[in-house]
UniProtKB/Swiss-Prot annotation:
Name of the protein this chain belongs to: Probable lysophospholipase BODYGUARD 4
A Pfam family of this chain: Abhydrolase_1
Organism, scientific name: Arabidopsis thaliana
InterPro entries, per the entry: AB_hydrolase_1 (IPR000073), AB_hydrolase_fold (IPR029058)
Entry annotation: catalytic residues: H154, S225, D367, H395
Length: 417
Protein backbone atom coordinates (compact mmCIF):
# COMPACT_ATOMS: atom_id res chain seq x y z
CA UNK A 1 0.00 0.00 0.00
CA UNK A 2 1.37 3.41 -0.98
CA UNK A 3 2.06 6.14 1.59
CA UNK A 4 -0.80 8.45 0.45
CA UNK A 5 -3.24 5.53 0.73
CA UNK A 6 -1.95 4.60 4.20
CA UNK A 7 -2.19 8.25 5.27
CA UNK A 8 -5.77 8.51 3.99
CA UNK A 9 -6.73 5.31 5.77
CA UNK A 10 -5.23 6.59 9.03
CA UNK A 11 -7.08 9.91 8.74
CA UNK A 12 -10.36 8.11 8.06
CA UNK A 13 -9.82 5.82 11.07
CA UNK A 14 -9.03 8.79 13.34
CA UNK A 15 -12.05 10.79 12.21
CA UNK A 16 -14.28 7.73 12.55
CA UNK A 17 -13.07 7.21 16.12
CA UNK A 18 -13.80 10.85 17.04
CA UNK A 19 -17.26 10.92 15.46
CA UNK A 20 -18.39 7.62 16.95
CA UNK A 21 -16.95 8.61 20.34
CA UNK A 22 -19.26 11.63 20.23
CA UNK A 23 -22.18 9.45 19.07
CA UNK A 24 -21.58 7.09 22.03
CA UNK A 25 -22.00 10.06 24.38
CA UNK A 26 -25.04 11.38 22.53
CA UNK A 27 -26.79 8.00 22.58
CA UNK A 28 -26.11 7.61 26.32
CA UNK A 29 -27.66 11.03 27.00
CA UNK A 30 -30.65 10.30 24.77
CA UNK A 31 -31.18 7.09 26.72
CA UNK A 32 -32.02 9.13 29.83
CA UNK A 33 -34.10 11.64 27.84
CA UNK A 34 -36.25 8.99 26.17
CA UNK A 35 -36.65 7.07 29.41
CA UNK A 36 -37.96 10.25 31.05
CA UNK A 37 -40.39 11.15 28.25
CA UNK A 38 -41.62 7.56 27.87
CA UNK A 39 -42.45 7.30 31.57
CA UNK A 40 -44.54 10.47 31.33
CA UNK A 41 -46.35 9.87 28.04
CA UNK A 42 -46.86 6.09 28.12
CA UNK A 43 -48.81 3.97 30.57
CA UNK A 44 -46.51 0.98 30.17
CA UNK A 45 -43.24 2.27 28.80
CA UNK A 46 -40.91 -0.22 27.13
CA UNK A 47 -37.36 -0.20 28.41
CA UNK A 48 -34.31 -0.02 26.18
CA UNK A 49 -31.40 -2.45 25.93
CA UNK A 50 -28.69 -0.12 27.24
CA UNK A 51 -28.61 -1.51 30.77
CA UNK A 52 -30.59 -4.71 30.22
CA UNK A 53 -28.89 -8.06 30.62
CA UNK A 54 -29.43 -10.85 28.13
CA UNK A 55 -32.14 -13.15 29.52
CA UNK A 56 -31.46 -16.78 30.31
CA UNK A 57 -32.78 -18.82 27.40
CA UNK A 58 -35.75 -21.09 28.11
CA UNK A 59 -35.70 -22.65 24.64
CA UNK A 60 -33.26 -24.48 22.42
CA UNK A 61 -34.86 -23.11 19.23
CA UNK A 62 -32.36 -20.59 17.86
CA UNK A 63 -35.06 -19.10 15.61
CA UNK A 64 -36.96 -17.98 18.70
CA UNK A 65 -34.08 -16.29 20.52
CA UNK A 66 -33.26 -12.59 20.71
CA UNK A 67 -29.87 -11.65 19.30
CA UNK A 68 -26.96 -11.06 21.65
CA UNK A 69 -26.22 -7.84 19.74
CA UNK A 70 -29.25 -6.21 21.35
CA UNK A 71 -27.52 -6.44 24.72
CA UNK A 72 -23.82 -6.46 23.85
CA UNK A 73 -23.25 -3.12 22.10
CA UNK A 74 -20.45 -1.49 24.09
CA UNK A 75 -20.71 2.16 25.13
CA UNK A 76 -18.14 3.54 27.57
CA UNK A 77 -20.48 6.31 28.78
CA UNK A 78 -23.35 4.15 30.05
CA UNK A 79 -21.84 3.66 33.50
CA UNK A 80 -20.63 7.24 33.99
CA UNK A 81 -21.54 8.93 37.28
CA UNK A 82 -23.24 11.92 35.69
CA UNK A 83 -25.74 9.67 33.91
CA UNK A 84 -26.54 7.92 37.18
CA UNK A 85 -27.22 11.31 38.77
CA UNK A 86 -29.39 12.28 35.79
CA UNK A 87 -31.42 9.07 36.09
CA UNK A 88 -32.03 9.65 39.80
CA UNK A 89 -33.23 13.20 39.15
CA UNK A 90 -35.34 11.97 36.22
CA UNK A 91 -37.07 9.32 38.36
CA UNK A 92 -38.12 11.85 41.01
CA UNK A 93 -39.40 14.32 38.44
CA UNK A 94 -41.26 11.75 36.35
CA UNK A 95 -43.08 10.38 39.42
CA UNK A 96 -44.42 13.86 40.19
CA UNK A 97 -45.49 14.51 36.63
CA UNK A 98 -47.16 11.11 36.21
CA UNK A 99 -49.55 11.78 39.11
CA UNK A 100 -51.35 14.48 37.14
CA UNK A 101 -51.16 12.70 33.78
CA UNK A 102 -54.05 10.63 32.41
CA UNK A 103 -52.70 7.90 30.19
CA UNK A 104 -54.42 6.26 27.27
CA UNK A 105 -52.80 3.11 25.96
CA UNK A 106 -52.05 3.26 22.24
CA UNK A 107 -50.96 0.69 19.69
CA UNK A 108 -48.19 3.08 18.69
CA UNK A 109 -45.55 4.81 20.78
CA UNK A 110 -45.67 8.59 21.00
CA UNK A 111 -42.58 8.74 18.75
CA UNK A 112 -44.28 6.68 16.00
CA UNK A 113 -46.63 8.00 13.34
CA UNK A 114 -50.31 7.74 14.22
CA UNK A 115 -51.79 8.77 10.87
CA UNK A 116 -54.67 6.83 9.31
CA UNK A 117 -52.40 5.06 6.85
CA UNK A 118 -49.85 3.94 9.44
CA UNK A 119 -52.56 2.65 11.81
CA UNK A 120 -54.65 0.92 9.14
CA UNK A 121 -53.33 -2.47 10.24
CA UNK A 122 -55.17 -2.16 13.58
CA UNK A 123 -58.47 -2.76 11.73
CA UNK A 124 -57.22 -6.21 10.80
CA UNK A 125 -58.41 -8.22 13.79
CA UNK A 126 -56.80 -11.50 12.77
CA UNK A 127 -53.33 -9.94 12.79
CA UNK A 128 -52.41 -11.43 9.42
CA UNK A 129 -49.83 -9.96 7.06
CA UNK A 130 -50.71 -7.82 4.06
CA UNK A 131 -50.51 -10.08 0.99
CA UNK A 132 -50.67 -9.05 -2.67
CA UNK A 133 -51.77 -11.90 -4.93
CA UNK A 134 -51.40 -12.14 -8.69
CA UNK A 135 -53.07 -15.25 -10.04
CA UNK A 136 -52.29 -15.44 -13.74
CA UNK A 137 -54.31 -18.60 -14.32
CA UNK A 138 -56.40 -18.22 -17.47
CA UNK A 139 -60.05 -17.35 -16.82
CA UNK A 140 -61.36 -20.35 -18.75
CA UNK A 141 -59.36 -22.60 -16.43
CA UNK A 142 -60.06 -20.58 -13.29
CA UNK A 143 -61.76 -23.57 -11.66
CA UNK A 144 -58.37 -25.25 -11.54
CA UNK A 145 -55.69 -24.53 -9.03
CA UNK A 146 -52.50 -22.94 -10.40
CA UNK A 147 -49.76 -25.51 -10.71
CA UNK A 148 -47.09 -23.30 -9.11
CA UNK A 149 -47.23 -21.05 -6.03
CA UNK A 150 -44.47 -18.51 -5.41
CA UNK A 151 -43.92 -16.56 -2.17
CA UNK A 152 -41.96 -13.30 -2.53
CA UNK A 153 -40.24 -11.88 0.58
CA UNK A 154 -38.79 -8.36 0.57
CA UNK A 155 -35.76 -7.06 2.44
CA UNK A 156 -35.08 -4.57 5.24
CA UNK A 157 -37.27 -1.43 5.15
CA UNK A 158 -39.09 -2.70 2.08
CA UNK A 159 -42.56 -3.97 1.24
CA UNK A 160 -44.42 -6.05 -1.32
CA UNK A 161 -43.99 -3.10 -3.73
CA UNK A 162 -40.42 -4.27 -4.25
CA UNK A 163 -41.83 -7.22 -6.20
CA UNK A 164 -45.19 -6.02 -7.48
CA UNK A 165 -43.71 -2.90 -9.08
CA UNK A 166 -40.75 -4.64 -10.70
CA UNK A 167 -41.23 -8.36 -11.36
CA UNK A 168 -44.93 -9.23 -11.34
CA UNK A 169 -45.78 -7.56 -14.64
CA UNK A 170 -43.07 -9.55 -16.43
CA UNK A 171 -44.28 -12.98 -15.30
CA UNK A 172 -46.99 -13.77 -17.82
CA UNK A 173 -47.28 -17.56 -17.80
CA UNK A 174 -50.72 -18.88 -16.91
CA UNK A 175 -49.78 -21.41 -14.25
CA UNK A 176 -48.27 -19.22 -11.52
CA UNK A 177 -49.88 -17.75 -8.43
CA UNK A 178 -47.61 -15.02 -7.09
CA UNK A 179 -47.89 -13.98 -3.43
CA UNK A 180 -45.91 -10.95 -2.27
CA UNK A 181 -46.05 -10.20 1.44
CA UNK A 182 -45.33 -7.23 3.67
CA UNK A 183 -43.24 -8.69 6.48
CA UNK A 184 -44.33 -8.26 10.08
CA UNK A 185 -43.48 -4.68 11.10
CA UNK A 186 -43.22 -3.31 7.56
CA UNK A 187 -45.50 -1.87 4.87
CA UNK A 188 -49.20 -2.40 5.57
CA UNK A 189 -48.68 -5.40 7.86
CA UNK A 190 -49.17 -5.30 11.66
CA UNK A 191 -46.48 -3.63 13.76
CA UNK A 192 -47.14 -4.92 17.29
CA UNK A 193 -45.21 -3.32 20.14
CA UNK A 194 -44.94 -6.57 22.08
CA UNK A 195 -43.24 -8.53 19.29
CA UNK A 196 -39.48 -9.09 19.23
CA UNK A 197 -39.53 -9.75 15.47
CA UNK A 198 -37.44 -12.91 15.71
CA UNK A 199 -37.07 -15.39 12.86
CA UNK A 200 -39.80 -17.49 14.46
CA UNK A 201 -42.17 -14.52 14.62
CA UNK A 202 -41.69 -13.81 10.92
CA UNK A 203 -42.03 -17.45 9.89
CA UNK A 204 -45.13 -17.99 12.03
CA UNK A 205 -46.92 -14.97 10.55
CA UNK A 206 -46.11 -16.08 6.99
CA UNK A 207 -47.52 -19.53 7.75
CA UNK A 208 -50.65 -18.04 9.28
CA UNK A 209 -51.15 -15.44 6.53
CA UNK A 210 -50.10 -17.32 3.38
CA UNK A 211 -49.42 -21.05 3.63
CA UNK A 212 -52.52 -22.02 5.63
CA UNK A 213 -55.21 -19.70 4.15
CA UNK A 214 -54.08 -20.33 0.57
CA UNK A 215 -53.66 -24.05 1.30
CA UNK A 216 -50.24 -24.30 -0.30
CA UNK A 217 -49.22 -27.91 -0.79
CA UNK A 218 -46.07 -26.85 -2.68
CA UNK A 219 -44.35 -23.54 -3.36
CA UNK A 220 -41.23 -21.69 -4.47
CA UNK A 221 -39.65 -18.88 -2.43
CA UNK A 222 -37.95 -15.76 -3.78
CA UNK A 223 -36.34 -13.39 -1.28
CA UNK A 224 -34.15 -10.30 -1.17
CA UNK A 225 -31.54 -9.21 1.40
CA UNK A 226 -32.82 -9.67 4.98
CA UNK A 227 -35.76 -11.61 3.57
CA UNK A 228 -33.33 -14.35 2.49
CA UNK A 229 -32.71 -15.39 6.10
CA UNK A 230 -36.46 -15.55 6.72
CA UNK A 231 -36.91 -17.49 3.47
CA UNK A 232 -34.32 -20.07 4.52
CA UNK A 233 -36.01 -20.55 7.90
CA UNK A 234 -39.44 -20.86 6.27
CA UNK A 235 -38.22 -23.24 3.57
CA UNK A 236 -36.30 -25.42 6.04
CA UNK A 237 -39.43 -25.78 8.17
CA UNK A 238 -41.40 -26.84 5.07
CA UNK A 239 -38.61 -28.64 3.24
CA UNK A 240 -40.99 -31.44 2.25
CA UNK A 241 -43.17 -29.13 0.11
CA UNK A 242 -40.84 -26.31 -1.01
CA UNK A 243 -39.56 -26.70 -4.58
CA UNK A 244 -36.91 -24.00 -4.88
CA UNK A 245 -35.39 -21.10 -2.99
CA UNK A 246 -34.02 -18.07 -4.85
CA UNK A 247 -31.84 -15.80 -2.72
CA UNK A 248 -31.00 -12.30 -3.95
CA UNK A 249 -28.10 -10.57 -2.14
CA UNK A 250 -28.33 -12.63 1.08
CA UNK A 251 -26.41 -11.35 4.14
CA UNK A 252 -24.66 -14.67 4.69
CA UNK A 253 -21.98 -14.86 7.40
CA UNK A 254 -21.41 -18.56 8.12
CA UNK A 255 -21.35 -19.74 11.73
CA UNK A 256 -20.42 -16.29 12.98
CA UNK A 257 -20.64 -14.90 16.48
CA UNK A 258 -23.53 -12.42 16.37
CA UNK A 259 -21.36 -9.48 17.40
CA UNK A 260 -19.03 -10.30 14.54
CA UNK A 261 -21.96 -10.16 12.11
CA UNK A 262 -22.87 -6.69 13.36
CA UNK A 263 -19.26 -5.56 12.89
CA UNK A 264 -19.19 -6.91 9.36
CA UNK A 265 -22.51 -5.48 8.25
CA UNK A 266 -22.33 -2.17 10.11
CA UNK A 267 -18.67 -1.48 10.87
CA UNK A 268 -18.20 1.94 12.45
CA UNK A 269 -16.83 4.11 9.66
CA UNK A 270 -17.61 7.45 8.05
CA UNK A 271 -17.15 6.49 4.42
CA UNK A 272 -18.97 5.66 2.25
CA UNK A 273 -22.04 7.61 3.49
CA UNK A 274 -24.30 4.56 3.16
CA UNK A 275 -21.99 2.61 5.47
CA UNK A 276 -22.02 5.46 8.00
CA UNK A 277 -25.83 5.57 8.01
CA UNK A 278 -26.03 1.80 8.43
CA UNK A 279 -23.61 1.91 11.37
CA UNK A 280 -25.50 4.70 13.14
CA UNK A 281 -28.89 3.00 12.78
CA UNK A 282 -27.52 -0.41 13.82
CA UNK A 283 -25.37 0.53 16.82
CA UNK A 284 -27.30 3.39 18.42
CA UNK A 285 -30.78 2.54 19.64
CA UNK A 286 -31.75 6.06 20.71
CA UNK A 287 -30.15 8.00 17.86
CA UNK A 288 -31.94 5.61 15.54
CA UNK A 289 -35.20 6.35 17.33
CA UNK A 290 -34.56 10.08 16.82
CA UNK A 291 -34.11 9.50 13.09
CA UNK A 292 -37.36 7.51 12.96
CA UNK A 293 -39.13 10.24 14.95
CA UNK A 294 -37.98 12.94 12.52
CA UNK A 295 -38.48 11.01 9.28
CA UNK A 296 -41.07 8.28 9.87
CA UNK A 297 -43.41 10.06 12.29
CA UNK A 298 -43.47 13.13 10.05
CA UNK A 299 -43.44 11.29 6.73
CA UNK A 300 -46.50 13.20 5.51
CA UNK A 301 -44.55 16.46 5.71
CA UNK A 302 -41.53 14.99 3.92
CA UNK A 303 -43.72 13.49 1.21
CA UNK A 304 -45.43 16.87 0.70
CA UNK A 305 -42.05 18.62 0.42
CA UNK A 306 -40.79 16.04 -2.08
CA UNK A 307 -43.93 16.43 -4.20
CA UNK A 308 -43.45 20.18 -4.07
CA UNK A 309 -39.84 19.88 -5.24
CA UNK A 310 -40.40 17.39 -8.04
CA UNK A 311 -43.72 18.83 -9.16
CA UNK A 312 -45.57 15.50 -9.15
CA UNK A 313 -48.69 14.27 -7.39
CA UNK A 314 -47.19 10.94 -6.49
CA UNK A 315 -43.75 10.04 -5.18
CA UNK A 316 -41.82 6.85 -5.86
CA UNK A 317 -42.86 3.76 -3.91
CA UNK A 318 -39.29 3.30 -2.64
CA UNK A 319 -39.47 6.62 -0.78
CA UNK A 320 -42.77 5.66 0.83
CA UNK A 321 -41.49 2.24 1.87
CA UNK A 322 -38.55 3.73 3.77
CA UNK A 323 -40.92 5.27 6.34
CA UNK A 324 -43.46 2.46 6.65
CA UNK A 325 -42.15 0.83 9.80
CA UNK A 326 -41.70 1.68 13.46
CA UNK A 327 -38.34 2.01 15.16
CA UNK A 328 -39.26 -0.99 17.30
CA UNK A 329 -39.94 -3.23 14.29
CA UNK A 330 -36.89 -2.12 12.31
CA UNK A 331 -34.50 -2.27 15.29
CA UNK A 332 -35.52 -5.77 16.33
CA UNK A 333 -35.65 -7.13 12.78
CA UNK A 334 -32.15 -5.83 12.14
CA UNK A 335 -30.70 -7.52 15.23
CA UNK A 336 -32.88 -10.62 15.63
CA UNK A 337 -33.11 -11.54 11.95
CA UNK A 338 -29.91 -10.29 10.30
CA UNK A 339 -27.53 -10.74 13.24
CA UNK A 340 -29.30 -13.51 15.14
CA UNK A 341 -30.47 -15.35 12.03
CA UNK A 342 -27.01 -15.57 10.50
CA UNK A 343 -25.85 -18.22 12.95
CA UNK A 344 -28.64 -20.62 11.96
CA UNK A 345 -28.40 -20.07 8.19
CA UNK A 346 -26.02 -23.03 7.76
CA UNK A 347 -28.42 -25.32 9.60
CA UNK A 348 -31.29 -24.27 7.33
CA UNK A 349 -29.18 -24.67 4.19
CA UNK A 350 -28.12 -28.16 5.23
CA UNK A 351 -31.74 -29.16 5.77
CA UNK A 352 -32.77 -27.89 2.34
CA UNK A 353 -29.87 -29.51 0.48
CA UNK A 354 -30.48 -32.86 2.18
CA UNK A 355 -34.12 -32.59 1.09
CA UNK A 356 -33.08 -31.97 -2.50
CA UNK A 357 -34.42 -28.41 -2.68
CA UNK A 358 -32.94 -26.33 -5.50
CA UNK A 359 -31.16 -23.23 -4.13
CA UNK A 360 -30.15 -20.39 -6.44
CA UNK A 361 -28.23 -17.29 -5.33
CA UNK A 362 -27.92 -14.00 -7.24
CA UNK A 363 -25.83 -10.98 -6.29
CA UNK A 364 -24.61 -7.83 -8.03
CA UNK A 365 -20.87 -7.24 -8.26
CA UNK A 366 -21.41 -3.57 -7.25
CA UNK A 367 -23.34 -4.34 -4.05
CA UNK A 368 -22.19 -1.94 -1.30
CA UNK A 369 -24.62 -3.17 1.37
CA UNK A 370 -24.03 -6.92 1.43
CA UNK A 371 -20.33 -7.77 0.84
CA UNK A 372 -19.71 -9.62 -2.40
CA UNK A 373 -17.81 -12.37 -0.57
CA UNK A 374 -21.10 -13.54 1.01
CA UNK A 375 -22.05 -15.38 -2.17
CA UNK A 376 -18.57 -16.89 -2.44
CA UNK A 377 -18.70 -18.08 1.16
CA UNK A 378 -22.03 -19.81 0.60
CA UNK A 379 -20.80 -21.50 -2.57
CA UNK A 380 -17.64 -22.76 -0.86
CA UNK A 381 -19.58 -24.11 2.12
CA UNK A 382 -22.44 -25.52 0.04
CA UNK A 383 -21.28 -26.39 -3.50
CA UNK A 384 -24.83 -27.45 -4.41
CA UNK A 385 -25.96 -23.80 -4.32
CA UNK A 386 -26.04 -22.26 -7.80
CA UNK A 387 -24.53 -18.75 -7.87
CA UNK A 388 -24.99 -16.00 -10.45
CA UNK A 389 -22.98 -12.77 -10.19
CA UNK A 390 -24.71 -9.96 -12.08
CA UNK A 391 -22.24 -7.53 -13.66
CA UNK A 392 -22.90 -3.85 -13.00
CA UNK A 393 -25.74 -4.46 -10.53
CA UNK A 394 -25.92 -3.22 -6.95
CA UNK A 395 -28.08 -4.29 -4.01
CA UNK A 396 -31.41 -3.29 -5.58
CA UNK A 397 -30.83 -2.63 -9.27
CA UNK A 398 -30.38 -6.29 -10.13
CA UNK A 399 -34.16 -6.47 -9.66
CA UNK A 400 -35.58 -2.95 -9.91
CA UNK A 401 -33.49 -2.13 -12.97
CA UNK A 402 -33.72 -5.52 -14.65
CA UNK A 403 -37.28 -6.68 -13.99
CA UNK A 404 -37.85 -8.49 -17.28
CA UNK A 405 -34.47 -10.22 -17.26
CA UNK A 406 -34.90 -11.21 -13.62
CA UNK A 407 -38.39 -12.61 -14.28
CA UNK A 408 -37.06 -14.75 -17.14
CA UNK A 409 -34.37 -16.12 -14.82
CA UNK A 410 -36.96 -16.98 -12.18
CA UNK A 411 -39.14 -18.82 -14.66
CA UNK A 412 -36.17 -20.86 -15.85
CA UNK A 413 -35.41 -21.84 -12.24
CA UNK A 414 -39.01 -22.84 -11.54
CA UNK A 415 -39.29 -24.83 -14.77
CA UNK A 416 -36.14 -26.80 -13.92
CA UNK A 417 -37.57 -28.11 -10.64
Amino acid sequence: MSFPRKFGTAIHAALSFIVFFFLDLLDAILCVVYEFVDEILEENSTGCYCTAAAPQSQTTDENELSSETLFGRRNIFRGMWFLGFAREFKSKLSRKLRKSKIHQESVNRWSDCGCKSCKSWTKNEDGNLHVVVKDSTSREYSVQEPSENVIFIHGFMGSSHFWTETVFEHIQKDDYRLLAIDLLGFGESPKPRDSLYTLKDHVDTIERSVIKPYQLDSFHVVAHSMGCLIALALAAKHSNIVKSVTLVAPPYFPSSVEGSVLNRIARKRLWPPLAFGTAVMSWYEHIGRCVCFIICKHHKIWEWLIKLCIGKREIHWKIKDITRHTHHSAWHSMHNVICGGSKVADEHLETLIKSGVKIHLMQGDCDQIVPSHCSGNMKRTFPAVEVDIITGADHDSMISGRGEEFAEKLESIWCSC
